[in-house]
Structure formats: C-alpha cells, structure tokens
C-alpha cells in the first residue's frame, strides 16, 4: 500500500519512482482516490525533475492500462495493425489519405483521432464536414469496419486511457502541459491502447508546430520512439516541416475536398505528397508489408494510380454512415461558404516567411475551430489555393482564397493572412519537408 504524498515527496526529492508506485498513482487518478492537488503536485515535480526511461515507460503503460486495450486476435486479420500520430499542424490532412493508402496495401489502421486543439485542425472535425459521418461507432461496428474495410477513423471513447483525460485537464490549468515525459505518456497511452504492431510519429517542426523549437521537437520525437519501443511497439518518427501550411488548403470541408482530389489524382500538393508518402513508407516497412523503402513506395504509388486507395476511402466513409458515392460526388455533399474571394498582397514579391500558427488561428476566428469545447464549427470556412514559401505573388497570384461566412469575417481573415505572410525581393532557400528520421 502506497501513500500518494510519499510518492510525490520521493519525486520532489529527485528520486526515480518504481513501476508499482506509478501504477498506484495512475489508478488513483482513474478511480478518483487521488485529488486534483496531488495530481498537480506530481505533474510539477515531473516537470522539474524529468523522468528516467523506465519511469517514462511505466507511466505510459499505466495510463494505457487505466482503460480498455483493444485486442484484434479474434478477428484473425491477415496483416499488421499500424497507425500514425501527428503532433498537429495547419493543413495537415495526411490521415485522410494515409489510412486508405496503407489499408489498400494490406495494413489495418484503427485510427483514434482528436478534435482541433488551439491553432491545429482536428481530423474528426474535418470528417464531420461529411454529412452523416459517424465518428463514434460502437465497439462491434468499429471492429467490423476494420475487418471489412481495413481503416476506420473514430473519436476517443471514455473507456480508452481514462486516467489521461483527468491528468491532462489538471496539467492544462497548472502550467505543466509542456513536459516531455508527460506529453509522451499522454500521446502514447491513447495510441498504444489501439493494440498496435507498429506506429509512426509525425513530429512537426517550425512556426506552426506544437513544440516551439527544432531541438524540443527532436527531443519529443526521441522520447516517443524510446518509450513506444520500450512498451513493445515498433515505432519510428519523422520530423516534418510546419513552417508553412502543409496542404493547399486549411479548414474542414476544404481539406476533405483536397484529400479526395489527392486520392483520385485530380490534384496533389507536392509537399503534402512528400510527407504523406514518407509516413506511409514508414508504416509499410515497420509493419513488414514491404522489405524496404523502394518496395513500399512502389506499392503505395500503385494503389494511388489504380484507384484502390480512393476506393478504400469511399468504403470507409460509407461504412461510417456517410454518403455511399462521396468520392464521386464530394462537391455535392461538402458545405460551401457564403463568400469565396481571393486576398492579394499589397506589394509584389516572393513569399519568404509564414506564421503558420497565426493562419491556423485565423481559421478558428472565422468559425472553423473551437475556442472552447462547447463552440459549434462552421465546416465551410477556411483557406484554399494557399501561396507557398518561394512563390511569387502579385496582382495576379493571390496569397490565398478565403472562404468566409460574410464580408466582415472575410475582411478580418484577409487582415490576418496579410500579417502572417512576409514577402521579400528574392525567393528564400527551400526547406526540406522531412528533416530527420528517428528510430531506436
């Protein structure tokens, strides 16, 4: 039998906690036998003293085991259970293509996703712009979709990692969110509860990233790879660029439109293609669906070219109660904004810098995201035809096309876009889309 205050004292004094102590504390968070004050105190001691790798693994596993852990054995699937997690960005619509692409290559992707957070868009919010799309199928239906289609994208239910929900709520109001061991455990508790064979992490770097510096993004990626492998799940991470909007669009319905166009081959933004492909390659090689990167790329290109990936996306939408002909007729189903108009720069020049975070917040301000949990989302608003770093803009080439609910909202968004995009006399050096791959 442990005492919560003794566990806090031990960590406060700089000592490592045992697996049993960590499990006792996390189970107490779940069972409400540990108070909010005690959660806050432990979070702050971890913030200042960090955690050893064994402590990090124990914390992650204890949080995972605080709820249901999915088990796929009874389905006798003929491929690996794999997933991807992104730390979030703007125009980061990779999940919508990646899930179907990997499923079309023989993987199974039980993707449990989130809503928008701060300036970053949420995969669930994007999918809910599709009429009827059900992000909370019951457990049996979820398993059926995985078995039949190969991919489902759903919301987190209360039975998955419940200790994380309470722990995070306390961290949020006590300035302990940005602690690498706590972020790692929070991300992985939910992902590892999916019962995965392999995981790839997409850790963003730059002005629209969750972590403020390259070094911190790198430290987070290394921590996640170390802990997830320590927990028995083959995991790699890619550090990818978020110094500009990743897709050509940012919003909800506008990003779903771009995802369908990507899958059908109608239009593929080159940077979005690079990042999506790199993540899919990791999933295929880690999941043993391809012997090397070259074979993985060839398989992925084939399912894009022969239409299989688009077909899987359509089947997923239909299985989750969306329209059965969504891929063919997406324009008919997706909501459109009242006012669609381009915004131009005041001077000519090359796009040299982009405050991606500010652009994400501009989408939220238009109604495309939530400022508080109770807010309703306007799925139709956002940006399309976004200028990229190095593009020459003038009276002919806009900075973006703004989809707004009215003139007032358009004016505010136009102001935000102009402030967020800096111009120069010459094009900047091009930045890589993938900076580094991290493996164990």
Curated annotation (Swiss-Prot):
Stated name of the protein: Thymidine phosphorylase
EC number from the UniProt entry: 2.4.2.4
Entry function: The enzymes which catalyze the reversible phosphorolysis of pyrimidine nucleosides are involved in the degradation of these compounds and in their utilization as carbon and energy sources, or in the rescue of pyrimidine bases for nucleotide synthesis.
GO biological process, one term: thymidine metabolic process
Short name of any one Pfam family annotated for the protein: PYNP_C
Quaternary structure note: Homodimer.
Pathway assignment: Pyrimidine metabolism; dTMP biosynthesis via salvage pathway; dTMP from thymine: step 1/2
Keywords linked to the UniProt accession: Glycosyltransferase, Transferase
Gene3D superfamilies reported in the protein's UniProt record: Nucleoside phosphorylase/phosphoribosyltransferase catalytic domain, Pyrimidine nucleoside phosphorylase-like, C-terminal domain, Transferase, Pyrimidine Nucleoside Phosphorylase, Chain C
Keyword Transferase: yes
InterPro entries: Glycosyl_Trfase_fam3, Glycosyl_Trfase_fam3_N_dom, Glycosyl_Trfase_fam3_N_dom_sf, Nuc_phospho_transferase, PYNP-like_C_sf, PYNP_C, Pyrmidine_PPas_bac/euk, Pyrmidine_PPase_CS
Organism: Escherichia fergusonii (strain ATCC 35469 / DSM 13698 / CCUG 18766 / IAM 14443 / JCM 21226 / LMG 7866 / NBRC 102419 / NCTC 12128 / CDC 0568-73)
Family per record: Belongs to the thymidine/pyrimidine-nucleoside phosphorylase family.
Keyword set includes Thylakoid: no
